[in-house]
C-alpha cells in the first residue's frame, strides 16, 4: 500500500510541469514548422509569464478571502484543463491565422497559455495539498516533479527533435546566396552562376527528419497529464485525502512573523528537534525558526528557482552548442536525469542545516556561473573544439541542476513541517523567482542580444 501511494504521489508530482517542459524540448522541431521560426521561444517566454496571473490570483484569494477556496476542486479543474489543452494541441498546433498581414500560430500560443496557467498554478495548489500526507511523501513528490522534465526529454531524444548533422555543401565563387530566415543555422538557398568556375565546399548544419510527428508527441503529453489526473483522484480516496484543505490557510494575516508551526502532535513540542522515521534527528528545529531564518529560506527558494527556471535555461543553447550537438543533447538529457536523482538523495542523506543548504546553493550557483560565462563567450568559449570542454560543460550542467534540486527539496521539507501556509508561500516564492529570472533574461537575450549563436559545423575559433 505504501509503495502504491509513493507511485501515485510521484505521478501526481510529474504532472506539475510536464506540459511546459514538453513544449520546451519540442521547440527545436517546432521552430522549423511554425511561422514564428526562432522567435517562438521569445513568444513562449512572454506567454508563460502572463500565466503567472493564476498563482497570483490564488495567493491573493487566500490572503484577503481566507477559507473561500479549496485546493481540491482547483487541482481537479487545472488538471482537466491541462489534459484537454494537450489533446487539442496535438491536432491544432500547426494551425495558423493571418494577423496584420502575417501568419501567426494563434492556436498554438493560446493553448500554450492554458498549459502554462495549469503548471504555474500547480506551484500554489499541489504543495499545500501534499501537506495532508506524511512528510516523507513530499520527497517523492519532488522526484515526480523532476521526472516532469526527464520523461519529455527522453521522448524528444527518441523522436530526434532538433538533431542536426554536418553536410558538405559545394558552391562556386559566383554563387548568389539567399538566406532562409526560418532557420537559425546558416542554411541558404543558392543560385549558381552559369560561368564555369572551380567548385568549393564547406560544412553546414542540416536538421534530420524526426522519427515521429509532433502529433504523437503531444498525445503522449496528454497521456501523462491524464495519468496525473487519475493519480490525484486515487490519492483523494486515501484516508487522509479528506483531511482538511486549504480553507484553513491564512485565517489571520500571514507574514513571516505570523506563520504558525504545526500542532505539537505533528511537529513535536516547541523547541524540540523534528525527527524523521528511521533517519534520526535533524539539524533544524522547525518550531524554533526565527523570522530571519524564514526570510532566508524564502529568499533561497526564489533565488534557486530564478536560476533553474528562468536564467540558465535561457542560455543553455548558447553555452552548449559551441561544443557540438552531442554535448548539447548530453547536457540537456543528463541534467534532466540529475534532477530526480538529486530528489532521491534526501531520502537517504537528509540535511536540514541552513548553513549546509546555503553552502550548497553557493556551490550550485558557481556551476551556473560557469555555464553563464560559457554562454557569454559563445560562439568561442573556453576549450571549444577540445574534448575536455565538452566534458566540463556537461558535468557543470549536471552538477548545477543536482545541487539546486537537493536544496529545493530540503527547503520544501522544512517548510512543510512548519505549516501548510508555509508551503503555500513556498509555491508563491517558486513562481516569483521563476518570473524574475525570465523577465531578467528576456531583454538580455532577445532585445540587447548579448549572446551570439553560430553554426557549429562551420565554426572557426582558431583566430
UniProtKB/Swiss-Prot annotation:
Phosphoserine occurs at: 245, 269
Q: Which Pfam families match?
A: SLC52_ribofla_tr (PF06237)
Q: In which tissues is it expressed?
A: Predominantly expressed in small intestine. Highly expressed in jejunum and ileum. Also expressed in testis and at lower level in lung, kidney, stomach and colon.
Could you list which ranges are Cytoplasmic topological domains? 1-6, 59-71, 127-137, 236-294, 351-353, 412-421
Subcellular localization, as worded in the UniProt entry: Cell membrane
User: What reaction is this protein's catalytic activity?
Assistant: riboflavin(in) = riboflavin(out)
Tell me the GO molecular function terms. riboflavin transmembrane transporter activity
Which superkingdom heads the taxonomic lineage of this protein's source? Eukaryota
Major localisation: membrane
One GO cellular component this record assigns the protein to is: plasma membrane
Q: How does it sit in the membrane?
A: Multi-pass membrane protein
Q: Which residues cross the membrane?
A: 7-27, 38-58, 72-92, 106-126, 138-158, 215-235, 295-315, 330-350, 354-374, 391-411, 422-442
Extracellular side stretches: 28-37, 93-105, 159-214, 316-329, 375-390, 443-463
Output the GO biological process annotations, alphabetical, semicolon-separated: cellular response to heat; flavin adenine dinucleotide biosynthetic process; riboflavin metabolic process; riboflavin transport; sensory perception of sound
Listed A to Z, the keywords are: Cell membrane, Glycoprotein, Membrane, Phosphoprotein, Transmembrane, Transmembrane helix, Transport
UniProt xrefs under InterPro entries: Riboflavin_transptr (IPR009357)
Q: Which residues are glycosylated?
A: 168
Per its database record, what is this protein's job? Plasma membrane transporter mediating the uptake by cells of the water soluble vitamin B2/riboflavin that plays a key role in biochemical oxidation-reduction reactions of the carbohydrate, lipid, and amino acid metabolism.
UniProt family annotation: Belongs to the riboflavin transporter family.
What is the designated name of this protein?
A: Solute carrier family 52, riboflavin transporter, member 3
Q: Which organism is it from?
A: Rattus norvegicus
- Source gene? Slc52a3
Amino acid at each position: 500500500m505504501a509503495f502504491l501511494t509513493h507511485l501515485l504521489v510521484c505521478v501526481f508530482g510529474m504532472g506539475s510541469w510536464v506540459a511546459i517542459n514538453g513544449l520546451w524540448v519540442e521547440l527545436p522541431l517546432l521552430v522549423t514548422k511554425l511561422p514564428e521560426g526562432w522567435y517562438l521561444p521569445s513568444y513562449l517566454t512572454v506567454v508563460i509569464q502572463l500565466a503567472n496571473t493564476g498563482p497570483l490570483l490564488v495567493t491573493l484569494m487566500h490572503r484577503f478571502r481566507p477559507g473561500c477556496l479549496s485546493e481540491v476542486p482547483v487541482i481537479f479543474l487545472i488538471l482537466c484543463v491541462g489534459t484537454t489543452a494537450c489533446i487539442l494541441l496535438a491536432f491544432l498546433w500547426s494551425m495558423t491565422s493571418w494577423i496584420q498581414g502575417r501568419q501567426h500560430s494563434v492556436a498554438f500560443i493560446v493553448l500554450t497559455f492554458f498549459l502554462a496557467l495549469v503548471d504555474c498554478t500547480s506551484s500554489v495548489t499541489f504543495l499545500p495539498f501534499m501537506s495532508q500526507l506524511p512528510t516523507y511523501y513530499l520527497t517523492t513528490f519532488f522526484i515526480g516533479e523532476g521526472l516532469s522534465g526527464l520523461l519529455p526529454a527522453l521522448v524528444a531524444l527518441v523522436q530526434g527533435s532538433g538533431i542536426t548533422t554536418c553536410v558538405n555543401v559545394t558552391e562556386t565563387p559566383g554563387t548568389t546566396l539567399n538566406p532562409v530566415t526560418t532557420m537559425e543555422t546558416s542554411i541558404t538557398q543558392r543560385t549558381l552562376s552559369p560561368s564555369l568556375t572551380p567548385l568549393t565546399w564547406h560544412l553546414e548544419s542540416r536538421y534530420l527528419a524526426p522519427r515521429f510527428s509532433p502529433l504523437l508527441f503531444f498525445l503522449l503529453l496528454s497521456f501523462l497529464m491524464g495519468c496525473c489526473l487519475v493519480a490525484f483522484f486515487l490519492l483523494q480516496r486515501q484516508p487522509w485525502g479528506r483531511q482538511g484543505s486549504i480553507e484553513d490557510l491564512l485565517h489571520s494575516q500571514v507574514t513571516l512573523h505570523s506563520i504558525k508551526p504545526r500542532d505539537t502532535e505533528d511537529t513535536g513540542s516547541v523547541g524540540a528537534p523534528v525527527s524523521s522515521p528511521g533517519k534520526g534527528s535533524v539539524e533544524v528545529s522547525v518550531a524554533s525558526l526565527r523570522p530571519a531564518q524564514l526570510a532566508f529560506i524564502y529568499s533561497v527558494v526564489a533565488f534557486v528557482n530564478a536560476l533553474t527556471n528562468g536564467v540558465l535555461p535561457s542560455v543553455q543553447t548558447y553555452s552548449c552548442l559551441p561544443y557540438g550537438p552531442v554535448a548539447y543533447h548530453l547536457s540537456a538529457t543528463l541534467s534532466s536525469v540529475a534532477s530526480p536523482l538529486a530528489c532521491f538523495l534526501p531520502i537517504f542523506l537528509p540535511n536540514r542545516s541552513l548553513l549546509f543548504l546555503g553552502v550548497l546553493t553557493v556551490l550550485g550557483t558557481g556551476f551556473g556561473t560557469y555555464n553563464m560565462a560559457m554562454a557569454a563567450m559563445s560562439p568561442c568559449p573556453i576549450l571549444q573544439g577540445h574534448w575536455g570542454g565538452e566534458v566540463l560543460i556537461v558535468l557543470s550542467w549536471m552538477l548545477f541542476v543536482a545541487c539546486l534540486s537537493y536544496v529545493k527539496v530540503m527547503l520544501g521539507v522544512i517548510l512543510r513541517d512548519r505549516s501548510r501556509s508555509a508551503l503555500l508561500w513556498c509555491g508563491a516564492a517558486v513562481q516569483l523567482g521563476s518570473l524574475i529570472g525570465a523577465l531578467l533574461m528576456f531583454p538580455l537575450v532577445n532585445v540587447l542580444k548579448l549572446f551570439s549563436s553560430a553554426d557549429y559545423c562551420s565554426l572557426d575559433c582558431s583566430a
